[in-house]
Amino acid sequence: VLARWLMRGIPYAAAGAALATLVPWLFWLGAAIAALTTLRHGLVPALPVLIAAALPAGWWWSQGDVIPLASVLLVTLMAVILRERMRWSEALIGGSLAASAMIQLGIFTPPGDTRLMLEELREGSPEIDRMLTEFTSQGFDTQVLAELVISGVTGLVVLLASIGCLALARSWQAGLYNPGGFREEFHALRLAPRELAVLVVLGVAGMLLGIAPLAMLGWVPLLIAGIALVHGVIGLKGMNGLWLVAFYALLITTWPTILIVLLLGLIDTLANFRARLARSN
């Protein structure tokens, strides 16, 4: 119902995007509206909606919250790529590169002393605590580490939120104009070997050249491809939706599940499990 109302015209979408982005914690809805309009009409016709979403988000930036504006811009970029190229994998790689550039430019670096935020991160994540302890023992500056970790985590959150907004926008578009199209498209998401090679090169280059954000976010497209693989297999097998609930519960709460999904996405790039499964069925 909401998507149908938004698609009645650009003024409706612009009003919805502006209102959603203005309300605290509803920036994701404004970003999804901007993405939906971009997917449907293209970047130039969608500019009024993008501006309507960006103005309140810019105000939030002036108040110290960069996440809404970064999310609106990032999801719009990915929507443009997805509309033009019709490949989720390319949109994800483009989004990861853009988010890495934002981190490298210091957009997500918090002002002032970051040590208190770093201590909160350490208390909330034993993995981060061990990693930082190891780096500190090697002589790295705590303040620099704090800024890198906090900006990196913020950039990761923005990237994942933007991917979620793009998925929401694509599902709206499919629901209005191509029922079932989003499910089919997402279930088929898989990185091509050349795209995997690009991610590997970017990750290695990031480590060698000291561009940490490339190494920090380069794995995200592979993670989404692994998630799509799980969705696709469950769909092909006609399994109960509770399997997806259990899968996401494990994905959110346990690091080993993330590593397994990454490995599955990596192997699927070469083996194409869904094509083999479809033939066997």
Regions found by a protein language model. Name each.
Residues 104-149:
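Membrane-interface interhelical loops and short interface/amphipathic helices
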Residues 29-35, 68-76, 212-223, 259-269:
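Hydrophobic core segments of alpha-helical transmembrane domains in multi-pass membrane proteins
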Residues 47-56, 91-100, 240-251:
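Central hydrophobic cores of alpha-helical transmembrane segments
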Residues 175-229:
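Small-residue-rich helix-loop
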Residues 1-52, 238:
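Hydrophobic transmembrane alpha-helices
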Residues 154-178:
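Transmembrane alpha-helical segments in integral membrane proteins
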Residues 216-281:
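Long, positively charged, glycine-interspersed low-complexity recognition regions
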Residues 57-61, 68-110:
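Short helix-perturbing small/polar motifs within transmembrane alpha-helices
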